[in-house]
Amino acid sequence: MSERRVVVDLPTSASSSMPLQRRRASFRGPRSSSSLESPPASRTNAMSGLVRAPGVYVGTAPSGCIGGLGARVTRRALGISSVFLQGLRSSGLATVPAPGLERDHGAVEDLGGCLVEYMAKVHALEQVSQELETQLRMHLESKATRSGNWGALRASWASSCQQVGEAVLENARLMLQTETIQAGADDFKERYENEQPFRKAAEEEINSLYKVIDEANLTKMDLESQIESLKEELGSLSRNYEEDVKLLHKQLAGCELEQMDAPIGTGLDDILETIRIQWERDVEKNRVEAGALLQAKQQAEVAHMSQTQEEKLAAALRVELHNTSCQVQSLQAETESLRALKRGLENTLHDAKHWHDMELQNLGAVVGRLEAELREIRAEAEQQQQERAHLLARKCQLQKDVASYHALLDREESG
């Protein structure tokens, strides 16, 4: 195969011409016109002031094959010296306008012209590289046709690349499923942790209601004891009042009539003496009766006053007893309402416990299922890892075979 020489004029002061050496090309398909019309990534990186590695790749690598070599033109083959690359780096850095150099339009225009010229030369070199790649591919295909085993090897490479791509996609799908399952488990855990404060608040409220019920029971017992003591005091006051009334009646009815037992004389003196004695007795009797009546009246007034005070006290006790009974009834109603509230809260707590138990059972079942799926996924991932290692081993073996084949081709070409 004949060699073609391309002379590249460098944008520096010293121009040089270097031969475009023959490079090894991979067995790629023909490059589309879009790769020729649009500037490649290497050109974009060169325009932005970034220096590529010593091997400058021209065109795009095929997406179907992972281990493709690609048509490559070295910096020496392109005829671009390191001095030009350093100048291009400094020029690319100078294109960033500083605040004090915004008016330097001439330098920017010169740099733009230099870049346009460089892009045109790179485009020409790409066309030359494409032609060389086509000729090299045709030459290698003709040799592979003569050897007779290149088609099977190429089919094996294509199937290996396809298997590796499918394995990568399947691994990504399994990773996505694992992340989705983990996110679902985290969501269930977060919901369970969010429900815990509500449950604790309900339990604290129920405990506070228990305390209120205990205090109400203690108050009820205290009021019942006070009512019993008031009833006993009222009974003792009633008995004392009856005893005082009976004693007063006895004092009023206790005056006994005196019997006259002296004989009546027949003489005037005896009659007068008898009348005088009788009169004295009547006077003394009247005086005693008047004193007794006065004393009885005083005692009656005192008893009436005491009775009035006792009646007032009894009325006050009746009012207090009525108020106490009203309070007891209200406390009983309150106790009944608290008991109803307690029963409702107990039912609610029972339902909440039942619901939480069901949720925990469901979560346990879900976690068990997820763990089983995770174990299956891990087993599949390990199997895929083994398959991937096997494919990588096959890929390395194929690369070694390709390298040996290229060495044979080089020896044939040199021979």
Curated annotation (Swiss-Prot):
It comes from the Eukaryota. GO terms for biological process: cell maturation; intermediate filament organization; lens fiber cell development; visual perception. The keyword Coiled coil applies. The modification N-acetylserine is found at residue 2. Keywords: Acetylation, Cataract, Cell membrane, Coiled coil, Cytoplasm, Cytoskeleton, Disease variant, Eye lens protein, Intermediate filament, Membrane, Phosphoprotein, Repeat, Sensory transduction, Vision. One of its GO terms (molecular function) is structural constituent of cytoskeleton. It is found in: Cell membrane; Cytoplasm; Cytoplasm, Cytoskeleton; Cytoplasm, Cell cortex. Lens. Residues 2-114 are annotated as: Head. Residues 115-144, 199-253, 309-400 form a coiled coil. SUPFAM superfamilies: Intermediate filament protein, coiled coil region (SSF64593). The modification Phosphoserine is found at residues 26, 32, 35, 90. It is a peripheral membrane protein. Residues 1-46 are annotated as: Disordered. It holds the Pfam family Filament. Residues 104-415 form the IF rod domain. Its main location: membrane. InterPro entries: IF_rod_dom (IPR039008), Keratin_I (IPR002957). Residues 396-415 are annotated as: Tail. Belongs to the intermediate filament family. It is linked to Cataract 12, multiple types: An opacification of the crystalline lens of the eye that frequently results in visual impairment or blindness. Opacities vary in morphology, are often confined to a portion of the lens, and may be static or progressive. In general, the more posteriorly located and dense an opacity, the greater the impact on visual function. The opacities can be nuclear, sutural, stellate cortical, lamellar, cortical, nuclear embryonic, Y-sutural, punctate cortical, congenital or with juvenile- and adult-onset. Part of a complex required for lens intermediate filament formation composed of BFSP1, BFSP2 and CRYAA. Found in a complex composed of PPL (via C-terminal linker domain), BFSP1 and BFSP2 in the retinal lens. Within the complex interacts with PPL (via C-terminal linker domain) and with BFSP1. Identified in a complex that contains VIM, EZR, AHNAK, BFSP1, BFSP2, ANK2, PLEC, PRX and spectrin. Interacts with LGSN. Interacts with VIM. This is Phakinin. It comes from Homo sapiens (Human).
